[in-house]
C-alpha cells in the first residue's frame, strides 16, 4: 500500500529518538514488511515461471508522486524497478530488457493505474504501459500482482462494508 516506505523510515527514526518507548511497550516491528511482501509475491508465481522467479515493480516513473516508495521497496526487496518501456511481450511471454539481453518476467508488482497497464487492452493512448501484458497475464505466463480491477479493495469508501463482510465471513468459518 502507498505510504509503507514512509512508515518504515519513520519507525526507524522513532526507535533511535525514543528507544525507551519501544523497550517499554510491545510495539510490533514493521521493518520486515519488504521481506513479507517479497515472500507473498513469490508465492503468487505463475505455473509457467522460470526457476529464478523474476519479480519486478512496475512504476509510472520518477515524475510520479509515489516514485520514492516504488524505488524504496524495489531496493529493500532486491528486485528490479521498471517502467513500461523496460518491458515487452513476445509471443505471450513478458520480458525485461537488460544489459545482458532479455530476461523473462514472472511477477509484476503493478504500481500504475489499471487503464495505463496495457495500451492494447485498455487505454490505447497510454505511454507508460506494456503492450500485450494483459494477454500474457491471462495466458498464465506472468502474474500481475495488484491485478487490474483489484483497486476497489483499497478504496477507503468501502472500508466499512469490507469490515462487515470480513466479520460475516469469519463467522461462517
What feature does the model see in each segment?
Residues 1-129, 135-138, 143:
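ATP-dependent carboxylate activation and anion-phosphoryl transfer catalytic cores
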Residues 69, 154, 158:
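Catalytic-loop motifs flanking and including active-site residues across diverse enzymes
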Residues 132-154, 162:
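Ser/Thr/Gly-rich flexible loops in soluble cytosolic domains mediating phosphotransfer, phosphorylation
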Amino acid at each position: 500500500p502507498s505510504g509503507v516506505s514512509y512508515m518504515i523510515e519513520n519507525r526507524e527514526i522513532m526507535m533511535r529518538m525514543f528507544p525507551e518507548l519501544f523497550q517499554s511497550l510491545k510495539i510490533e516491528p514493521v521493518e520486515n514488511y519488504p521481506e513479507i511482501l517479497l515472500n507473498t509475491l513469490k508465492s503468487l508465481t505463475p505455473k509457467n515461471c522460470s526457476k529464478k522467479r523474476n519479480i519486478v515493480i512496475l512504476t509510472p516513473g520518477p515524475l510520479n508522486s509515489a516514485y520514492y516508495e516504488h524505488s524504496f521497496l524495489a531496493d529493500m526487496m532486491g528486485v528490479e524497478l521498471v517502467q513500461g518501456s523496460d518491458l515487452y511481450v513476445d509471443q505471450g511471454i513478458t520480458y525485461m530488457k537488460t544489459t545482458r539481453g532479455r530476461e523473462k518476467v514472472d511477477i509484476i508488482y503493478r504500481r500504475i493505474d489499471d487503464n495505463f497497464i496495457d495500451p492494447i487492452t485498455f487505454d490505447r493512448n497510454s505511454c507508460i504501459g506494456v503492450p500485450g501484458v494483459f494477454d500474457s497475464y491471462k495466458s498464465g505466463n506472468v502474474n500481475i500482482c495488484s491485478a487490474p480491477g483489484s483497486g476497489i479493495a483499497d478504496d477507503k469508501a468501502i472500508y466499512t462494508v469490507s469490515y462487515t463482510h470480513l466479520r460475516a465471513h469469519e463467522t461462517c468459518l
